[in-house]
Amino acid sequence: MPSTPTTPTTTTPITASYWCYSCTRFVSVWADQGTTTVGSVACPHCDGGFIEQINDSSSAATELTIPASTEVRSINNNRRSVIRRRRSGRRPSFNPVIVLQGGAGEREEGEEGDAARDRRAFEFYYDDGSGSGLRPLPDSVSEILMGSGFERLLEQLSQIEASATGIGRSGNPPASKSAIESLPRVEISDCHIGSEANCAVCTEIFETETEAREMPCKHLFHDDCIVPWLSIRNSCPVCRFELPSEPNRRSNNNEEDNAVGMTIWRLPGGGFAVGRFNAAMRDGERVLPVVLTEMDGGGIGNSQDGPRRISWVRSHGTLESDSNGTGSGSGSGGRLRRMVRGMVSLMRRVRPNRSSSSSSAAISTSSDNLDLNIEVESRVLDRSNSVMRRYFRRNRSNRDSSSSVLH
């Protein structure tokens, strides 16, 4: 008896996450693209087979998801975006990886030394564009990133962030104004010069009958040397004695523990763009942004797609504030405005075999429901324009020197 054909269901096809070593990015392969056949899986972007399936061993409680309605829209947008990219033959522009600084990971059994320190220093999350939300990056891929010099890059970015905004400062906080003003002024005498001949900040020799400021640890400094120093850090330049610092004004009844995070995109033609944000611990739950990229309908460079948006979700998937401005209330909106920082910087990857590299530009993230700091955005754009001017000026001088040699 001939078998009756089964009617295809209308359920959403299952996706699998893969890491493409050719594209150096996460990709989603749909079940109807031949993933059920062994050895037939290929990257949907480069059609290469050098890919590895990512087995997510994390529990469902640690997954960071977005609401189901948003997932359906993201899945449909993702499939349409893949079709458009295949027709145009254009390589996708963005590949977001969420990086959090200062992870509170627990030391695993048998783990010690630098391995434990590096694992707790940063937390990695990724979104393959399938609409499943942010998930922890597998250990195998994290080791590849950290082993390729990625850790040094993150450390440099963290230092820049701490010095620029003071957020997530890993060193000493500034001394309080009252502590600085209370430092006694002493007149330098021969006995002072005998015990301490020069200022440790400017290294200039003290002159008798001049005025200096004395720390509680009895070390002397010029007034115009130690005051700027203590306004940045509260420790003595010589013995690291610490003065009282200002209380943390950002701490409130909710006890929000902010941590600096970064979002990294690959740019077309080489290079990376890095956006910074704050993540927080609220009620014991990590709050992370969902960054809508070109994959799921928030593309950059396409005027009809509108501006980029950032949505914040709790670890259980509760939407804090969506891209259309509908949030959980004015209280959470106020906290978001305090946390989100619109400063974005651009890094260019240097390629020694190329005579010229692609020009860089800063990418600014915007949101309908968040008040971004216009002054910070202007400062970032000015810095980017300065970099571009230096780049084109250097190329013009190189061309002029080459033409003079030929003539």
Curated annotation (Swiss-Prot):
It comes from the Eukaryota. Induction: Induced by abscisic acid (ABA), and drought and salt stresses. Pathway: Protein modification; protein ubiquitination. This is E3 ubiquitin-protein ligase RDUF2. It catalyses: S-ubiquitinyl-[E2 ubiquitin-conjugating enzyme]-L-cysteine + [acceptor protein]-L-lysine = [E2 ubiquitin-conjugating enzyme]-L-cysteine + N(6)-ubiquitinyl-[acceptor protein]-L-lysine. Residues 316-337 are annotated as: Disordered. It is found in: Cytoplasm, Cytosol. The lineage of its organism: Eukaryota, Viridiplantae, Streptophyta, Embryophyta, Tracheophyta. It comes from Arabidopsis thaliana (Mouse-ear cress). Its EC number is 2.3.2.27. It is an enzyme of class 2 (transferase). The gene is DURF2. Keywords: Abscisic acid signaling pathway, Cytoplasm, Metal-binding, Stress response, Transferase, Ubl conjugation pathway, Zinc, Zinc-finger. The keyword Repeat does not apply. It holds the Pfam family DUF1117. One of its GO terms (cellular component) is cytosol. GO terms for molecular function: ubiquitin protein ligase activity; ubiquitin-protein transferase activity; zinc ion binding. InterPro entries: DUF1117, RNF126-like_zinc-ribbon, Znf_RING, Znf_RING/FYVE/PHD. Disruption phenotype: No visible phenotype under normal growth conditions, but mutant plants have decreased sensitivity to abscisic acid (ABA) and reduced tolerance to drought stress. A zinc finger (RING-type) spans 199-240. E3 ubiquitin-protein ligase involved in the positive regulation of abscisic acid-dependent drought stress responses. Possesses E3 ubiquitin ligase activity in vitro. GO terms for biological process: abscisic acid-activated signaling pathway; protein autoubiquitination; response to abscisic acid; response to water deprivation.
